[in-house]
Amino acid sequence: MMRPPEHQLLSSLDQRSRDIFRLIVETYLNDGDPVGSRNLSRLLPHTLSPATIRNVMSDLEHLGLIYAPHISAGRLPTQIGLRFFVDAFLEVGDLPPEERSSIEAQVRAAGTSNSVESVLTEASQVLSGLSRGAGLVLTNKTDVALKHIEFVRLEPMRALAVLVMQNGDVENRVIDLPAGISTSQLIEASNFLNAHIHGHTLSEAKSELRKLSEETRRELDQLSQELVAKGLAVWSGAGADQPARLIVRGRANLLENVHAQEDIERLRHLFDDLETKDGMVQLLDLAEAGSGVRIFIGSENKLFSLSGSSLVVAPYRDSEQRVIGALGVIGPTRLNYARIVPMVDYTAQIVSRLLR
């Protein structure tokens, strides 16, 4: 069944229907249980008979906003209903000052180690602890400025290519050396690369080298030229343009309040997705597509659609306002969105400041 656009859907609901719908969703977000007409009649601020409430619930069900998980059960919001609630009714306020202070203190304390890894790990830990979901942070290595590259000979025909980022990260790859290359040629190749890649991102550095004139290339002998080509090409293989790091904390939180076999199966799918990290670059694309916090519910979240999870995610940026990663919270569809949205937003702001 095709549902009408959100503004038409909202205008089609009278105040009584809106109140009942909001109460059904809020009850679900609080405890995950279906709510029936008798309980609703006690919870509503104005008096309505259970029969009247059942008629309203029937209309809401016809619109695809709620459903009955069992014949004799109360009602739960559908995925469409949750999306409608988030878009039309969710009231997001500011984080309490004490939570803002706690987030900033913990993430900044990790920043004193001058390790990007520490900052990102602490951010995911903070989000996990405050949300009772799983906190995740994703960063894309191709958007990090390079500091230098060097080659360390391991064997006559093999060397370790060491790529150092300006944020302190270090990545290593083992490469095959051109036959007959000398130690002085290794040094010459690394010096040449460093003269042209410093301060550039990996993708920019590759582009810069492609633009070099033939005359500039002739500064190197043939073997050194081969090594220069291999030096950055080693980061061009499968997965090189994928996010370099996915940090997840708080998986155990997702096991709380799991009752049904269906819930366990959904969690299995989610854990598998988090473990394989397949398609994680899409998460950066999703975050970058919006200007702030984005909410993906159930199948809207293509990465974790089989798990029936919700994802609240925001980008964090470098000093030039380029998106260099994303952070957020993943959990059941009954996340406390009103609390988690400002939490994710503020954490992204703090991480952005620390990484500039």
UniProtKB/Swiss-Prot annotation:
UniProt keyword Membrane present: no
Keywords carried by this UniProt record: Repressor, Stress response, Transcription, Transcription regulation
GO terms assigned for molecular function: DNA binding
A Pfam family the protein falls into: HrcA
Keyword Transcription regulation included in the entry's annotation: yes
NCBIfam families: hrcA (TIGR00331)
Family: Belongs to the HrcA family.
Protein name stated in the entry: Heat-inducible transcription repressor HrcA
